[in-house]
Amino acid sequence: DVEKRNKALKKMVLFTLIMAIICLIYMLVTSYLSEKSKFVIDLSTLELVQLEEPEDGDPIAVIDTSLGEIRAVLYPEYAPNTVANFTELAESGYYDNTYVFHSEKGVYSAAGCLNKNGDLPDDFDKSRELVERELHQNLWPFKGALCSMTTTFKQSFGQRFTGGGTYYCGSRFALLNTVDITDEMKQQIFDLSNSEKLTDAFAEKGGVPNFSQQIVVFGQVYEGLDIVEQLSELKVEENEGSTKIPVDDVMINSIKIDKYSSEKTEKEAVE
């Protein structure tokens, strides 16, 4: 009997040890994946390219709306797949006569949808709505940022337990205005980034800091900021949904992809 009890005790100790090792491995893997998924900013290489003027030859989007024209420089070097998707859709005429379907009071507007309520059409091209989210430390949600809106989030079976997953973006885009950048918010930006340069940029330019490294920024408006402001101040319908649909139709008439020319810009300014 004593020998049986000893064997049973050894089995119990061995089982407990094995379970402890499994739990430890699980915790280490989870911790590793969690750390791996965090977005790290390298302050030594941080370049706030949106604060710079476009250079001759840079790709731009000329967005013609029913309220006026917006011009934005694009950043294929930082968000290549997003810019390619947007460019191909624009050049195909997809955005012609699409709706500004959301206006968040003073903060941002969302546009580029065939349906007024922002829903994708039944026959939408799934490949256009499954562009993996591209974040870059040089791109931030400053005022005038041109952003790609998130369409879906996918997780594998294992990721449901360990965390992680993949966000995808698509055809619809957002134009950011700004929230009130208070002293408290500036302190929060600095505490999270440890970057005076980034904090000062938000303070001077404005934007939506809460979107930082959450939304894909792929362009920056350099002409037509007054139109961006108007688009975020539209009168909207009263409804229980999350989409704040403008009462009056505001349209994206067309989007033309072009190259920036300082000479052309100077001539237009004179005219």
Name the predicted role of every residue range.
Residues D1-E271:
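Cyclophilin-like peptidyl-prolyl cis-trans isomerases
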